[in-house]
Amino acid sequence: MIRFVLQKIKNKKWLTTCLLLGLVFLVAAVSCQPMFKAGSLNKMLLDSFHNAGEEAEAYPTVIGRTGAYVTEKRQTAAAVLDGVKGYQQTWEKYLGSIKAVNTQTILTLDEQSAQGAYGGKGKYLRVSYMPDMLAHTQVLVGEDYDAYAENLYGCMLSESVMDACGFTVGETLEFPLWTDAGGETLKLQICGIFKETDSTDTFWYTAPNTMEQEMFVSEETFDAIVKQFAPEKINYATNVLLDYTKINQKNVADVQYYIEQFHKEDESFTDSFLNLLKQYQKDKKTIDITLWVLELPLLGLVLAFIYMVTGQIIDTEQGEIAMMRSRGYRRSQIVALYALQACILCLVAMLIGTPLGYGLCKLAASTTDFLTFHAGNLSMYHFTPVMLVYGLAASAVGILFILIPVVIHSGVSIVQQKSDQKINKKMFWEKYFLDIVLLGVSIYLLHNFNQEIDKIRARALLGAKMDPLIFLDSVLFIVAMGLVVLRLLHYLVQLVYHIGRKKWRPAVYASFLQITRNFRKQGFISVFLILTVAMGLFNANAARTINQNYENRIRYADGADIRLQETWKMQAFYVSANDIDYNYVEPDPVKYDEPVKQGLCTSMAKVIRTNNISVSRGKTKIANCEFMGIHTKDFGETAYLQEELNRDVHWYTYLNELAQQENGVILSKNLAAALEVKVGDVVDCSRYGDSVMKKETVRGTISGKVVAVVDAWPGFVQYTYEDGEETEHYLIVANYAKTVQSFKISPYEIWYKLADGVDSDAVRAVIDASGTKLSAYTALDRDIDAMKETAMIRITNGMFTLSFVIALILCMIGFLIYWISSIRQRELLFGVYRAMGLSEKEINRMLVNEHLFSTLPSILAGGACGGVATYLFVRLFGVIYLPQKHNLSIYVYLDQMDVLKLVAVLMVMILLCIVILRRLVRSLNITQALKLGEE
């Protein structure tokens, strides 16, 4: 039987090769899913750790404990450290492969009042000991405590303690309330001032500049003080920095479980990343659903291709099947024969498809946009054994789809076969109007989704998993509309045929006859072509819309190409016994002009920003408004506002109005509505004191005349969200000079507009070279790149691109299969036409006409279906990906380049197919066919 099957494969080598190709793509598409999922989850997890570290400016994955041991049980630092080490060993035992990259443990005695011998400020300080500290410190003044050789106990202070207390090296610190049994007070001599050797050293999880009460002594000194002064307890705080690169999608659930158990069993246990792990579990569900939902249309197309090719094979072997039945073969034997053939093909498909799936996953992971690739870091996407299991499951489904037409045709006898050939049956969906029903169901679901769009947005904001039915409904709509359009095309072709059937030339008449009589056979490839074009266009538009709206919101929120703010010094002073005032010391502003002078930037603007503002009119008062003080000319040349927001009145008009009114202010629309004011009214803008002052102290007030009310403004985000809770913000903009006059000079941001071809790193290098210490930094290009690197965006772009590429390849092959089979089957008919007097040119013209009234309408219909689906569904997709309320509405983008890419690829496909078909027609043994036709 195996030999017979191999002979069958050899006899139908081209169709079998196409079937094998379909199985290969099925195995590849399914087997790449676990690899893509694992890589995406690992990347999402790693990105969450990186982002958390950058936001907190601290190492992201830390576990620890704070506590104390009574000195009756543990009287030395070593004994306390042994106790702490016991906890650390317990954590290490359960966390397994998640090793520590560093550990910081601090032992302290209770704080006591200290007084410097040179009259430094009295302050409560703690005697502290930190193991291995000297290996990570740099002594700025004096010497470390190991080199200290005086009679008094020696200690080291950080720069922050020295600055806060005014102590100096060599000064003796006395603790008058801390006495030993003989009544002698504790005295420490400052032997050195230190700072960390490297600010990026993970040893310093708690940095020296944040330790404002610690005096560090050696272990021997610490033990001697404990022994002499007998404190009640020794406090400790230990922080273990875990290697987060070892936390991945395989072990993250175990890590989360053990961290939760540590908290449950030990109230003093602390961690910095449990919330990240919980958020990961929520996002994981979304990624699981998104991957499958985005891949289902592709799997449907591949399975349809397999079914179509199998149908072509069965059509050519119907006579053979009927003969086998007439010779006594049972249906089960015939099905078993084809099942064996399918198993052989699936085995080969596994060998080819699994490595191909690996390559396709790498391809999908490298996408930054639809059909746009960037070879970045793909190390997290690697082979996983589960791919083989998925490949086997895909092979089983492929075998099932191969056997469906076999089972249908295996019971046909020779008599039934001959009679069926004379009947031009309607397709099932056409006969029972299934296309109309499915289209109605899809539109009904779409209507329901649009009615519940606020609920969908709310669920997305709360982190609930997305509803896959929304994505599946878009696929259902495209399929149903494709079938409806195909039905209409059939009616249209019949209408054109009937209108001109008495006028058509023979070649044209024959082509219309071929189209109308073979609609069932040709309909399948037409549907495949329509779906490929429609889904390709829809995927391109959906990906472009999601990407561009993300980018627009980032661009709007950033306001300019670069925003930075330097750390300013605050000088506070008493104005009375109970009141404090302060002045800010402005850093040298000359260095900010350097990027413009070097041609890296075209403009620069100073922007005073604060949200410590209240705006009032009459008895109505709105607190915590966002305030901007701007130079209108510089701001207009530097800031950016999307064109969509400038359609009615360009925002430069508002800047001109503000420039003409010294005390003018611009209000956001929601603030104007809350205060019930309009242009020309006057509002009071009061600024409150910063951290060292009481918040109710008004630092200054501007009585401003409203010159404009705006819906949007560069850098102003009206709504922000935290844990699903919405917070609305208000904006007021004033002139820079009036701001400084009323509120005094205060920290401002520097906004830059980059020159063409310059990236933000070049500007950052210039700023860093000047020694500027920044408290805030935002770069638009980095933010956009980070967005494109997120797991969800990569998955969306990757799956849309992958689906289109595979569908296009299969469409081209399916297109060739149909036309090659059609021409092969019509070789005798061509001979008859030639015998009737048709020339070779007329035969070619007949084929061209068939393409014009079958292939071209299918492509145009696919474009129409994709366009309508884009109009109806893409905005809904945008709400799922971007559920937050925003000053920018979700715009649907139809990029001409995406359409041109699609058209170019389709044209290449069609031209290639036409070239192959022309060569095939020329290679036909037309002389023999002509003789058969004459006979």
Kindly give the residue locations of the regions a language model identified.
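N-terminal Sec/SRP start-transfer signal
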Residues: 1-28, 34-35, 420-438, 486-533, ...
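Membrane transport/envelope proteins' first extracytoplasmic loop
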Residues: 1-303, 312, 366-371, 378, ...
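Alpha-helical membrane-protein architecture signal
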Residues: 2, 332-336, 340, 426, ...
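Interfacial "coupling" helices/loops that link adjacent transmembrane helices in transporter permeases
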Residues: 12, 304-345, 412-428, 435, ...
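Small-residue-rich transmembrane alpha-helices
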Residues: 307-310, 319, 343-375, 385-414, ...
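Short cytosolic juxtamembrane segments of multi-pass membrane proteins
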Residues: 378, 410-429, 884, 919-935
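Juxtamembrane segments of multi-pass membrane proteins
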Residues: 455-471, 475-653, 669
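C-terminal transmembrane helical bundles of large multi-pass transporters
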Residues: 748-750, 772-875, 882-889, 913-916, ...
